[in-house]
Each structure stands twice: as C-alpha cells, then as structure tokens.
Amino acid sequence: KHLDYCWVISLYHTENTQVVHARNVVCTWKPILVFRKGRSGKIESCSGHAMVDSFRNDYRDKEFHEWGQGESAVKYLIETFSNPDELVLDPMAGGGTTLVVAKETKRKCIGIEIDPVYVEKIKANLMKSKSVSMF
C-alpha cells in the first residue's frame, strides 16, 4: 500500500530563524508534510478533535542536530496523527528526536538518515532514552 497525502502543517519558530540567502528571505516556519496509510476522508486528530494546521515551536532543540525540533512539537504531531502501537515514519531522522518520542509514546517507528555521523548520534540518543528497546 502507498501513503496518501493528508495535509501540510506550519511549524512556526520563535527563535533561531534562518535567512535563505539566494532569495534574501528570513524563514520563520517549517512545513511539516503529513501522509497517512489506511485512513481517508475527514481529517481529524486521533483524539477525535479538529486538527490545528499551524502551531508555534517555542524551543528548537539543536543538541542532536542543527535543524532539530523540540520534543514537545514532535510529541504533538505524533499524538495528533497516530495511536499507540501504530507506525511513525521519519524519512529525515536527523538527531533521532522523532524516534525517541515515538518510542516514549508507545509507537513503532522507522527513521531514515543517510549521514553516518547522525546515524551514530541517533543510536546514542535511543540508548539514552528511558523507554527504548533498540533494534
């Protein structure tokens, strides 16, 4: 089965914004593309409430990756779009925040990262996480 496009969410950053040099634009938000498998029709969060398609990321956690997201933003997305025991996919895993939060919220997870340096950081972050059994 394939994934179906669901929506795009705007994640606004309150600090650490970047200038896109080629266009001379200060970028204050990041698009989060949401895809789903096996769900169609009306968009609802897994809690049954209406989904909010923009929210503020008050803290950008750059400890694990230079473009890292705070755990609270990742937790909001995971809990909005998945239930416990469902699968979460992060195709650009970076420092592994999504994988750690997915495990801590009882989700299965797959992370993809091509940079070997960050693959090792992900492994270390997963080992430090309090509720993670790895591999």
Residues of each region from the PLM?
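Class I S-adenosyl-L-methionine-dependent methyltransferase module
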Residues: M127-F135
